[in-house]
C-alpha cells in the first residue's frame, strides 16, 4: 500500500462514509481554515486496486520557501486500534511528506483516551494507545488533552429524567421567564452573528457547512416579557393562597406550631419574595423590549451520525438567566425525533471547584493529547518545534 494525493471530491466522499467522520476532517473545515493561511492537503492510503484504507486532511503552512509543517485536526480517518494499519499508514505518510520537505505534522487523534462519568469517576481507560503511538515514533505532547461532555440519548422522556435536578430546574425557570427557542433561518443570521465574538468566522461556517453530512444550524432564545409577567402573576396568586393558609394555621391556637409548619411558611415567604422580584424584572424588560429580546444562541453541526455543539453565545445583559441549557435541550428533543442519539455537548472546563456541563449526566470524554510525527529530525530539534503549537 502507498499514499496518494486525493482530490477534494475523493476525500469528501471517503470522509462522509468513514466511521470516524467528524466535521474537522472535512472539505468544509479545510475551506474554513484557508482563511487562516492554511493550504489543505488531502491524502489517502490505497492498495493495488486503488481502494482507500485510510485518509487524512493535513492543513499545511510554509515555514519558509522550502520547508513546511502540517496540522491534522481530530487525527486521521483511520481505526487507531488497527495497529498494523496505523503502522503502514505512518510509514508511508512519512515517506510521502519527506518528498514535500515537511519538517513535522501535529496530530490530534480523535481517540477516547479516558472515559469518565459526570462525577469524574473513571469508567474506561484507553491510555495504552499512547504507548502504541510512541512505538511508531510519534512524539507525545503533554498537557494538550481536551475534555468533552458526550451524551447518548434513547428517547426524550428518559433523557430529560436522567438530567441532574439542577439542570431540570434551570430549564423550568427559563420556561417561567417566557423564554422560547426557535431555529434560525436566513432572516435570523445577523441576530446570531451579533451574539458571537468572531462574526467573520461564523459567517463562513454558515456558508460552508451546508452539506447534509456536515450541516450547520443555529438556534436562538428569546424572552417574551408579557408571558414572563403573566407566568409570575399566576405563581404569585397561587403562592399567596398557600401563604395565607399557612398563616391562618400559625395564628390558630388550636393548631400545634410544628417545626415543619414554620419551615413551610418561611419557604412560602421566600417564594413570594422571589416571584415578586421576578415580576419586577419582567416588567422592566417589557418597558425596554416591548416586542421581546433575543438573549442567547447555540450553533451546531449535524453529520447524520451525531450532533456537535460548536458555539454557545449570549448577551451580557441577560447572561445571568443561563438560557443556553434550555436551547440545548430543545435542540436535543428535535434531534432525537429525527433519529439522532449521540450528542457532543462541547468542551468542558475543569477548575478546582467546578466541572461544567455535568448536569446533562453524560460521559466526560478525555481526548488524547497531541502527537508530533517528525519528518526532518534535525530541523525539528533545531527550531524547537516541539515547544510550539500551530496557530
Residue ranges and their predicted role:
Residues 3-49, 54-65, 114, 136-143, ...:
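A conserved beta-strand-loop-helix scaffold within acyl/acetyltransferase catalytic domains
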Residues 8, 31, 119-158, 286, ...:
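Active-site/acyl-donor-binding loops of N-acyltransferases
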Residues 67-141, 290-291, 304-360:
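Acyl-donor binding region in acyl/amide transferases
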Residues 74, 186, 223, 362, ...:
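Active-site donor-binding loop signature of nucleotide-sugar glycosyltransferases
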Residues 79-80, 165, 373:
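Generic structural "secondary-structure junction" signal
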Residues 103-105, 192-195, 343-345, 389-391:
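A general structural signal for short secondary-structure boundary/capping elements
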Residues 109-110, 148, 183-187, 311, ...:
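Acidic carboxylate-rich catalytic motifs and surrounding loops in phosphoryl-/glycosyl-chemistry enzymes
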Amino acid at each position: 500500500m502507498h499514499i496518494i494525493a486525493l482530490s477534494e471530491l475523493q476525500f469528501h466522499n471517503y470522509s462522509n462514509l468513514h466511521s470516524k467522520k467528524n466535521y474537522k476532517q472535512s472539505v468544509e473545515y479545510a475551506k474554513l481554515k484557508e482563511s487562516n493561511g492554511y493550504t489543505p492537503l488531502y491524502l489517502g492510503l490505497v492498495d493495488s486496486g486503488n481502494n482507500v484504507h485510510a485518509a487524512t486532511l493535513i492543513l499545511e503552512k510554509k515555514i519558509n520557501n522550502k520547508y513546511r509543517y502540517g496540522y491534522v485536526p481530530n487525527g486521521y480517518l483511520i481505526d487507531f486500534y488497527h495497529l498494523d494499519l496505523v503502522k503502514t499508514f505512518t510509514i508511508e505518510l512519512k515517506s510521502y511528506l519527506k518528498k514535500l520537505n515537511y519538517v513535522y505534522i501535529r496530530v490530534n487523534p480523535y481517540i477516547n483516551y479516558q472515559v469518565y462519568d459526570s462525577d469524574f469517576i473513571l469508567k474506561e481507560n484507553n491510555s495504552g494507545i499512547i504507548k502504541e503511538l510512541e512505538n511508531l515514533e510519534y512524539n507525545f505532547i503533554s498537557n494538550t488533552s481536551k475534555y468533552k461532555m458526550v451524551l447518548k440519548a434513547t428517547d426524550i422522556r428518559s433523557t430529560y429524567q436522567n438530567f441532574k435536578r439542577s439542570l431540570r430546574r434551570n430549564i423550568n425557570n427559563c420556561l417561567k421567564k417566557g423564554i422560547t427557542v426557535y431555529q434560525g433561518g436566513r432572516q435570523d443570521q445577523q441576530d446570531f452573528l451579533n451574539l458571537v465574538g468572531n462574526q467573520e468566522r461564523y459567517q463562513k461556517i454558515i456558508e460552508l457547512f451546508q452539506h447534509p453530512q456536515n450541516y450547520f444550524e443555529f438556534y436562538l432564545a428569546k424572552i417574551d416579557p408579557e408571558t414572563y409577567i403573566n407566568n409570575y402573576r399566576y405563581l404569585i396568586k397561587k403562592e399567596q393562597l398557600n401563604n395565607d393558609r399557612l398563616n391562618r394555621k400559625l395564628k390558630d391556637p388550636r393548631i400545634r406550631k410544628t417545626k415543619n409548619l414554620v419551615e413551610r411558611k418561611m419557604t412560602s415567604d421566600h417564594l413570594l419574595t422571589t416571584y415578586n422580584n421576578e415580576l419586577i424584572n419582567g416588567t422592566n424588560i417589557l418597558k425596554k423590549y416591548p416586542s421581546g429580546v433575543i438573549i442567547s444562541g447555540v450553533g451546531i453541526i449535524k453529520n447524520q451520525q451525531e450532533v456537535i455543539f460548536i458555539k454557545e453565545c449570549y448577551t451580557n445583559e441577560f447572561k445571568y438567566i443561563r438560557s443556553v441549557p434550555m436551547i440545548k435541550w430543545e435542540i436535543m428533543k428535535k434531534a432525537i425525533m429525527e433519529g439522532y442519539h449521540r450528542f457532543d455537548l462541547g468542551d468542558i472546563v475543569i477548575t478546582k471547584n467546578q466541572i461544567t456541563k455535568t448536569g446533562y449526566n453524560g460521559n466526560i470524554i478525555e481526548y488524547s493529547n497531541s502527537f508530533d510525527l517528525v519528518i526532518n529530525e534535525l530541523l525539528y530539534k533545531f527550531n524547537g518545534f516541539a515547544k510550539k503549537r500551530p496557530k
